Amino acid sequence: MAKQIQYLLISILAIIMLLPSCEEVKGTPEEFQKKRKTILVYMAANNNLSEDAKNNLADMQKGYIPEDDGNLVVYYHYPNQNPLLLNITHNETGAVAVDTIYRFPPRNSATASSLKSAINVTATYFPAEEYGLILWSHATGWLPVNYYATNPQRSLASDGSYPLDNMQQNSHTNPFQEYINGEDPYAEIVKMVKGNNNGILSRSFGSEEGSEIDIKELVNALPFKFSFMIFDACLMGGIEVAYQLKDSTDYLLFSPTETLANGMPYSLIMQHLFSNPTDLTATAKEYYNFYNSQTLLRYATVSVVKTSELENVATVAKEIFDTGRDKISSIDIKGIQQYFRNNKHWFYDIEDFIGKIATQEQAAKFNEAINKAVIYKAATPYFISIPINSEKFSGLSTYIPYFNESELDRYYKTLEWNSACGMIQ
């Protein structure tokens, strides 16, 4: 009787609360039949993005929800609660329902072990012929753990080399004032977490209590190959990330710049992700069109990569680095398309960069390889303070070993991309 009363109280509390924070576990793995596709959205939101996660979860409930052919599953870690595995579905009356399928013990979601556990539990409860994975949180591409925290950057105001965006140009006050004071005026609208006094903490993916998932750890956390992976996170659209993940997924959708904290328009994209076959190009177009139509926050970059073409990109790149590596130190780096703000000079356009050190014939061969790998790309004219030249936008970023950062160069040598192309010897 006591257990029945306890269960009743928990159920009542679950109904009252707006967030899906109930502790009830619904069903057992044996009750779930294998379907065509399962999509897991891994929302590591036990951080300053929690309200954005809440809004995105609500948006998912407004869009396409699969019936007999698929499962929409969300790993949801909101502050002050244990992570939950949620299934967005329809109940017996046809109304949208968010069922709590599994309640995880207290954990840090910005670890490889937590991600791997979430994927394995999802596969157990929601077996499918194919799986898609959306990684939602903070991110800073391929950089090693805590590199930002231990490597402060110069203020934008110290060199004045980067142009203002259209909003800043209309300001009657010093547009760099907040940078001079050590603050980023756009910190609240992008998926970037503030760190210590040195600047911003870095991570390949995820951020919680100072923990991050290194890109190499991320690969090891994926227990099987996904048909597609999407990063709703900053700066993941680089050749280093793509090449590291080439054996973990068939396709990637990500952004070479930062991403806005508002996230993807989930109510619009799910129909494309659950289509058969998955239409990542339509998904990317939906994302781009959504932000390109905005009046104030008209900022977005997006790329779709076919990972089976990346080996050829590396082969061609190696030929270029073998003959043009010595030219890197003398290139006009300010003339290369950048994808960073705040002088975080680790993300440049790969095609624009290669064109500076390759022969005309080599550059043409490389461009052909990139165009086969990047099957869709789009960018607004600006991403905040970064002008995006459509003729230079290849859809992929790269590191350029120009600033004599020995620690970063040593780490870069451990990445699969550098092992394949030999940019840094």
PLM-predicted stretches and their roles:
Residues 1-2, 16-39:
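Bacterial Sec-dependent N-terminal signal peptides
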Residues 36-38, 67-73, 126-132, 223-228, ...:
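Loop/turn elements at helix/coil->beta-strand transitions in domains of secreted/extracellular proteins
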Residues 45-48, 78-82, 107, 137-143, ...:
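Solvent-exposed loop/turn segments at secondary-structure junctions
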Residues 49-84:
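N-terminal carbohydrate-binding/catalytic regions of secreted carbohydrate-active enzymes
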Residues 52-53, 84-85, 143-148, 241-242, ...:
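Short, solvent-exposed loop/turn and secondary-structure capping segments
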Residues 77-101, 130, 134-206:
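Surface-exposed loop and adjacent secondary-structure segments within mature catalytic domains
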Residues 164-425:
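Terminal, contiguous helix-loop blocks that mediate binding/assembly
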